[in-house]
Amino acid sequence: MLLKKKKRNIWLAILTMSLVLEGCGAMGGNVKSQIQGKSNQTEVLALLETEPILDYEVPNVFPSILVNRIGYEAGAEKIAFITGEKLPVQYHIVNSKTRDIVLSGNIVISEFNEKTKEYIAYADFSTLTEEGTYFLECDKIGRSYDFTIQEDTHEMLMTECINSLKDIRKNLSKEDVKEVCSSISILLLSYELYGAVYDRQTQDNYLPKLIEEVKAYVQQLLEWQDTETGAMMNGETPLYEETAWLTAVLAKFSYTYQKFDSAYANACLQASDKAWKYLEKQDVEIESGLLFYGATELYRATGKYMYYASVKELGAGLSLNLVEEAQTFGTLTYASTKRKVDVDLCGRLLGVLLNRAEQIAEQAQENSFGIGCSIKEESLEEILWDAMIISSMDYVITNNEYATMIQNYQNYIAGLNETAVNFIQFPNKIQFDIDEKEEMSNLIGLDYVNTASYIMILSEIMSHEQEE
């Protein structure tokens, strides 16, 4: 059940105060997901004309049965959405190969959409755990796209996503520095919060596949860095913002990588420090949140007072009303450091993220699909960023509602959305419905930032599966 708004706000205030009193260093998690989901679609009717109309646009026609097109985990909840002006009582799950009905059940009507004049219902077929390829059909409505049920769906998705990072990396250039740094930040955060998900894939002290790929990205950054100044350069022109990103990411990687190779980690830390000192000498304006991120990472990695002082000075001027990307990373780093922190500053900044997470949760209560926004109103990047915030805060406060929302985001991205589009595609495996190259380039599996964000979602889901 979703928390009532009034009770949530009281609970949030108590929680934030407890985090301040504890020094902002504690994080942990345990969840079991619940069913939540609705759908909102419009049925398009074709009208016959007595005279041919040559100037027209073909309307988009969307399926009335929505499923997770990338597939369901065998032991997880399995939900489909059904919409229509008139709905049948039952649904049937059909084996795609044999055409045998393997499961039947009653649909549950959730609401009536006044705009589309359609009922919205869901079918819960969680009891079906046998691996295979299926589709869902209903009388008078039709059938869904095919979907699979597998024991290792999430494991497969994680492997494919990490492998796709390697393919994407081949086409990177120095123009991509900021996006590369953002991706590395998300991936390392995922490892910091949900490392057990990746470590279980590692044998004989080899690097986790995720860290191995992140190292390759970091190596590319080091090759782009000017060895003399420590800055990112475009010819003779310094790239100040890119240099600030470099400072933060190299220090962050150094902190994580020291347990695998202390010598390489130290080299990254020295490169980060060199970039920071270069920026200190420049009379230029750089976003405070970005400098704050770099300072928090260098402080956590070195413990030096100069970085502690910079964190306090920069943090004091940060907005308490916005959730900015670099500020978010810096806040989570500062909250997790084992070194001395300014408890008041830490609590105030962490409160910004907690408040944003609660805003997303409240918006999700009004959304038919149980997430904080819609692909019709926001970009895929914005949807994934909201999910990244929820994934992080679920680790901080262990909230059953947040875990449910992340499941909803995962389903939404894979086809349980207004347009039935699967936004997850992998190189050489593009098989679904987005044809425009501009749109395809942003898909998970083809875009490194969005792929990193989706990996974060998967790591949160898989961590809870380990606990069950």
What are these regions (language model features)?
Residues L2-L12:
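Bacterial N-terminal signal peptides that target proteins for export
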Residues L15-L21:
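Hydrophobic core
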Residues T16, L66-R143, E151-D152, D167-C181, ...:
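Aromatic (Trp/Tyr) and acidic
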Residues I35-V61:
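N-terminal low-complexity, Pro/Thr/Ser-rich intrinsically disordered segments
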Residues L189-E213, K252-C268:
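Short coil/linker segments at helix-helix boundaries
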Residues N205-E228:
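Carboxylate/His-rich catalytic cores and anion/metal-binding grooves
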Residues W276-D283:
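Selected transmembrane alpha-helices and immediately adjacent juxtamembrane segments
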